[in-house]
């Protein structure tokens, strides 16, 4: 279990998506030439055939560029059509004879000779071609197929008297030419005319495929090659100096570093280093950073690849890439193989999660990984590091001794861890004297390393936009609000909407102030921000690692405060409490079905955990009567809390009205001002005050956010899924299978 992020409930309205900055009107900078100083390296380089990541250079020293046909795919299609059309024209028109009139041998041809209208003939076998002295039309002009021309052709029948024809031609002074019979075009010409265009098209595609193969590292034949990115030990700029806030995980990995540096030290004593290390933890905790730091500290080659990159639509490619990756790592040993998001291919086999029988490509890839890890010799200095956010769904064969037998949980940092992370990320950021990193660490429970890095970056961008020389305390505070809630919106709400929003948020705040064990109220606001029309911030005084029943019931009461306040004051309801209802229902269901906080159910888990579904799809794990009893217990807890909140707000109606008046006047009230406006004494213990009390989002999935609970009226039909930076401990769901904190859904205001 880990610490709580601040919680929030909100009056939701969707913030329009921000437009990306436009480059319109700007003159694009001239790109430096390939050989000019300061020019960036050409990214279109291909890995060397040895797979070691050495770029293959072209003749001019630059990277080999992939060939791009003008016009893309359409250009290629047009080019092919032009070739086919050219072939048809050559065969049909270019070699076709000029226009001639074809006349019968008898009586037309013979009659034209006798009339003296034949000037010259050329005889080729039985074919006669020649020229008339005057135009001849055949067939007659009234025929639609008639042709008029001086050139003619005819065929001499086999039974014709050639001697008589010869005498007739001589008598009429006709010039006679003769040539041997033409048996058609030569074999070479026929081949060129018939297959030339096809051969040309094939040659074009071969040329294009070779160019693309050179640019993509092998083209079609590279499917089975590993696509792992390799970085040498000297190139890795990440070391344990860049890792902070996760000392326990760092200590676990130091032994791996020592083995890679001094393997003889362990082999001499018969020790065997773990073949695989599994890093698990919520997103953003630094699993990938840890793996790179191990490679950087050890100074060995680092092969990194996402598990999803192994699988392609071609069967067998995943297993082939696994073999190639491990082959490269063994050749470069000592080395580290890092597989990110292992659950993409390492999901447990069987159990109804996929095809029953059948040949699943992911299973082939998983089997190949298991085989390769079994094939490591005890002296092979190759360490496999994998990262996953969901270790509970991994196949048991991956986790047995001899494979990923060392498991390192990378948890969300505590307050001291967050302070160390902030120091790492602010090394290159000039901070003003009023920035207190300890206060920031205290005000960000539940945030992980990625969230804190984003916070520092947003603060730096905000300071630059404001023209500050250094990042100030106000920059950090405003950046934290923006990261958690989004930017402020200029929304013109009616007086009635502002008043209803003020009562909704004040209801959350008053219940939080008067409920024992609830998180302190840090800030109340009716200024629209992000997807909220108003928010109430709550956060614990210190990181929480466990939750008692009183605390969880208190969270349910605070979630009901806004809805009950509307009932009391306006006598009707709105859809603005949708996310509140989802959140309190999720807490109550987990109290009954997972945490054993119901005497009627007892210490029995009747809600399936996220990683362990039913054995077969559609098969329930609990009986209908048990499920009905769970629903009854959930209703009992919620109804009891609703009655208590109604009594509390009726008794303190004056405090509620007073806080609403302060909100309508000031719009935003900090912790001290909120208690003063409500007329209640602040009995909370002293705590280190952050630069501005802010909530932290929680992991939308599996953790309880004990932090600020933004209470809210959400906007109409605008669902808003808020993913948290992370929580320090497991968190109850917002619905029957989800968790509290993290899922904030906007309703209809």
UniProtKB/Swiss-Prot annotation:
Residues 1-67, 679-749 are annotated as: Disordered. Disulfide bonds: none annotated. It is found in: Cell membrane. InterPro entries: AAA+_ATPase, AAA_lid_3, ATPase_AAA_core, ATPase_AAA_CS, FtsH, P-loop_NTPase, Pept_M41_FtsH_extracell, Peptidase_M41. The active site is at residue 505. It comes from the Bacteria. It is a multi-pass membrane protein. The keyword Iron does not apply. GO terms for molecular function: ATP binding; ATP hydrolysis activity; ATP-dependent peptidase activity; metalloendopeptidase activity; zinc ion binding. Its main location: membrane. ATP binds at residues 281-288. The chain crosses the membrane at residues 76-96, 187-207. Its cofactor is Zn(2+). Acts as a processive, ATP-dependent zinc metallopeptidase for both cytoplasmic and membrane proteins. Plays a role in the quality control of integral membrane proteins. In the central section; belongs to the AAA ATPase family. HAMAP family: FtsH. This is ATP-dependent zinc metalloprotease FtsH 3. It comes from Conexibacter woesei (strain DSM 14684 / CCUG 47730 / CIP 108061 / JCM 11494 / NBRC 100937 / ID131577).
